[in-house]
């Protein structure tokens, strides 16, 4: 894959991830003036995750680093635009939620309950459940840590 193809894929990924970020921002009743910034932050988060995954990181660590980036930028933008950081960050990380892994784990659990236990189905269930749980944990910790770092009142040492 050439560099042009990679950049086009990255741009496509960023544009397509900005759409659900704006959609969820509208569901969460974000002010209209903040909607473009939610879209930009969602695109930056998903694009940075794609960059890290293409550099060789796994999806869990890439998601953690991308959510750290989203949280840090969201805190800075909240200072500039006098809004709460969650206005920008929560809708921006929604496109990074692990829908396919969670869905596959859920379908595997339903199949096990209907058809009975089988080892391959249990492996599929556990693999996808742990992957989805790790990604959701990475998103929540990655969004929390910048606030803990940047709003700290006491000295670090």
Swiss-Prot record:
**Compartments, as annotated in UniProt:** Cell inner membrane
Record-linked InterPro entries:
ThrE_2, ThrE_Dicarb/AminoAcid_Exp, YjjB
Q: Which Pfam families match?
A: ThrE_2
Domain of life, per lineage: Bacteria
Query: Mind telling me which residue stretches traverse the membrane in this protein?
Result: 8-28, 55-75, 87-107, 129-149
For membrane topology, the record states: Multi-pass membrane protein
Q: Which UniProt keywords apply?
A: Cell inner membrane, Cell membrane, Membrane, Transmembrane, Transmembrane helix, Transport
GO biological process: any one? succinate transport
Might you report a single GO cellular component term?
plasma membrane
Subunit field text: The transporter is composed of YjjB and YjjP.
Family classification: Belongs to the ThrE exporter (TC 2.A.79) family.
Question: What's this protein's function?
Answer: Involved in succinate export with YjjP. Both proteins are required for export.
List the HAMAP family hit by this protein, alphabetically. YjjB (MF_01191)
Q: What is this protein called?
A: Probable succinate transporter subunit YjjB
What is the name of the gene encoding this protein?
yjjB
């Amino acid at each position: 894959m050439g560099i042009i193809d990679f950049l086009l894929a990255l741009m496509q990924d960023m544009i397509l991830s900005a759409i659900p970020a704006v959609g969820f921002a509208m569901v969460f009743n974000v002010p209209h003036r903040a909607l473009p910034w939610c879209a930009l932050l969602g695109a930056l988060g998903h694009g940075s995750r794609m960059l890290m995954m293409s550099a060789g990181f796994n999806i869990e660590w890439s998601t953690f680093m991308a959510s750290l980036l989203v949280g840090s930028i969201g805190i800075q933008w909240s200072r500039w635009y006098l809004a709460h950081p969650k206005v920008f960050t929560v809708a921006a990380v929604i496109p990074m939620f692990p829908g396919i892994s969670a869905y596959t784990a859920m379908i595997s659990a339903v199949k096990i309950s209907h058809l009975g236990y089988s080892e391959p189905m249990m492996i599929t269930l556990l693999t996808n459940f742990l992957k989805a749980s790790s990604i959701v944990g990475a998103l929540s910790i990655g969004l929390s840590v910048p606030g803990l770092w940047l709003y700290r009142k006491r000295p670090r040492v």
